[in-house]
């Protein structure tokens, strides 16, 4: 993998990731394909939304179908028939999310298999081996996602163990002769001094990119923005920066403004299945009765298959009837919305007009702008 930094606008970066399997324009949003599928979508449909890279889930694909089945097909690309780049998480977030059915030790994590109840063990070394078999274009180190709230002492202990796991991940990755990319994950909760230690030591170990973990786990938005603004300038400029598990459209905008290059989140697909649709002027909750006889397209400014062919009334009808097609059409639209948002951010950075784009985004969606954005716009007369 090669990262090319093409342009900057303030802290925002316009770049390009070059893989053997294709090019990814950044800032980029990665749809989530937890089980080897973006729910309800064929790979061709996902590609048509503008997505250039997907995220897969190491933990779930390890449990089912397992490494043996994956290797029979070649790798995850062959298994799911997506031949663009794939990033896989390491399983570390499952440490965070499984709660009471886990036990964290220095060597790794013991889980109770949520499928059959068996006790299983996942270590940094095992995570690297699974991701090697998956053929991941971007491999993530194995870490612990520190919960929120955590006091400083616990956050320090967790961050330091994640650093030891990072070194073990790096060693096993190299032993396997893996020629793909390996990303480090910066931890430290909402404490700037801990984040400083984490990023410094990860850079000393050396990785192909750096992810910001442990955010969007319940902390106030102001803390997320503060940590990103503090942290991004410390990440080497020639390496991509990935904000894990984020997020809402406004989170993508604010992440880009602070120097983030890559994002992933289940929000566009999960919300689509619940009738919560993102549009240029905000949100359409398609289940509401007001859309029963609305013949307008979902979003007149959107070029997706759904908006080009169907009315709000039809989407409302499908949702009320619990038709599978409704969830699919909603998903197509939400994923396209996210890709259009990222394309708009890229163009704005290219043209040196990011702050104008940000101002228009908040004006059109009717969301309150974070204080920093308000201050900038007031100064610039936007």
Curated annotation (Swiss-Prot):
GO cellular component assignments:
cytosol
As to how many cofactors bind and how, the note says: Binds 1 zinc ion per subunit.
- Which E.C. number(s) belong to this protein? 2.4.2.29
InterPro entries under this entry?
ArchSynthase1/Queuine_TRR, TGT, TGT-like_sf, tRNA_ribo_trans-like
Q: Record's superkingdom?
A: Bacteria
Positions of region (RNA binding): 245-251, 269-273
Give residues annotated as binding substrate. Answer: 89-93, 143, 187, 214
Annotated keywords: Glycosyltransferase, Metal-binding, Queuosine biosynthesis, Transferase, tRNA processing, Zinc
One Gene Ontology molecular-function label: metal ion binding
Q: Which reaction does it catalyse?
A: 7-aminomethyl-7-carbaguanine + guanosine(34) in tRNA = 7-aminomethyl-7-carbaguanosine(34) in tRNA + guanine
Q: Does the keyword Zinc apply?
A: yes
Q: In which pathway does it act?
A: tRNA modification; tRNA-queuosine biosynthesis
Could you say which enzyme class this protein belongs to?
Answer: transferase
Tell me the residue numbers annotated for binding Zn(2+): 302, 304, 307, 333
Required cofactor(s): Zn(2+)
To which protein family does this belong? Answer: Belongs to the queuine tRNA-ribosyltransferase family.
User: Subunit structure, briefly?
Assistant: Homodimer. Within each dimer, one monomer is responsible for RNA recognition and catalysis, while the other monomer binds to the replacement base PreQ1.
What does this chain do?
Answer: Catalyzes the base-exchange of a guanine (G) residue with the queuine precursor 7-aminomethyl-7-deazaguanine (PreQ1) at position 34 (anticodon wobble position) in tRNAs with GU(N) anticodons (tRNA-Asp, -Asn, -His and -Tyr). Catalysis occurs through a double-displacement mechanism. The nucleophile active site attacks the C1' of nucleotide 34 to detach the guanine base from the RNA, forming a covalent enzyme-RNA intermediate. The proton acceptor active site deprotonates the incoming PreQ1, allowing a nucleophilic attack on the C1' of the ribose to form the product.
**Name of the protein this chain belongs to:** Queuine tRNA-ribosyltransferase
The upper taxonomy is:
Bacteria, Pseudomonadati, Pseudomonadota, Gammaproteobacteria, Enterobacterales
Which gene name does the record give?
Answer: tgt
């Amino acid at each position: 993998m090669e990262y090319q930094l093409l342009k900057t606008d303030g802290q925002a970066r316009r770049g390009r990731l070059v893989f053997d399997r294709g090019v990814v324009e950044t800032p980029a949003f990665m749809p989530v394909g937890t089980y080897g599928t973006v729910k309800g979508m064929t790979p061709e449909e996902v590609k048509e939304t503008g997505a250039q890279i997907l995220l897969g889930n190491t933990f779930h694909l390890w449990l089912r179908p397992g490494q043996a089945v994956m290797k029979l097909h070649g790798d995850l690309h062959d298994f799911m028939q997506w031949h663009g780049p794939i990033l896989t998480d390491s399983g570390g977030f499952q440490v965070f999310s499984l709660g009471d059915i886990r036990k964290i030790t220095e060597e790794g994590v013991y889980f109770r298999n949520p499928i059959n109840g068996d006790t299983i063990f996942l270590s940094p070394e095992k995570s690297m081996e699974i991701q090697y078999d998956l053929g991941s274009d971007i491999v993530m180190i194995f870490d612990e996602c520190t919960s929120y709230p955590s006091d400083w002492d616990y956050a320090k202990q967790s961050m330091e163990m994640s650093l030891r796991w990072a070194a073990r991940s790096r060693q096993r990755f190299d032993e396997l002769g893996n020629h793909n990319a390996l990303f480090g994950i910066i931890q430290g909760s909402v404490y700037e001094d801990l984040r400083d230690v984490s990023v410094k030591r990860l850079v000393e170990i050396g990785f192909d990119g750096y992810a910001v973990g442990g955010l969007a786990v319940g902390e106030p938005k102001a803390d997320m923005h503060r940590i990103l603004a503090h942290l991004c300038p410390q990440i080497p400029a020639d390496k991509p920066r990935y904000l894990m598990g984020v997020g809402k459209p406004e989170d993508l905008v604010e992440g880009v403004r602070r120097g983030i290059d890559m994002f992933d989140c289940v929000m566009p697909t999960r919300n689509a299945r619940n009738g919560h649709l993102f549009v240029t002027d905000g949100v359409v909750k398609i289940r509401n009765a007001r859309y029963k006889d609305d013949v307008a397209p979902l979003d007149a400014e959107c070029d997706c298959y759904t908006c080009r062919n169907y009315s709000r009334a039809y989407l409302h009808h499908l949702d009320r009837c619990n038709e599978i097609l409704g969830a699919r059409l909603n998903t197509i639209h939400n994923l396209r919305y996210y890709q259009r948002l990222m394309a708009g951010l890229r163009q704005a950075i290219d043209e040196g007009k990011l702050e104008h784009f940000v101002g228009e985004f908040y004006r059109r969606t009717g969301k309150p702008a974070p204080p920093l954005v308000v201050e900038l716009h007031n100064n610039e007369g936007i």
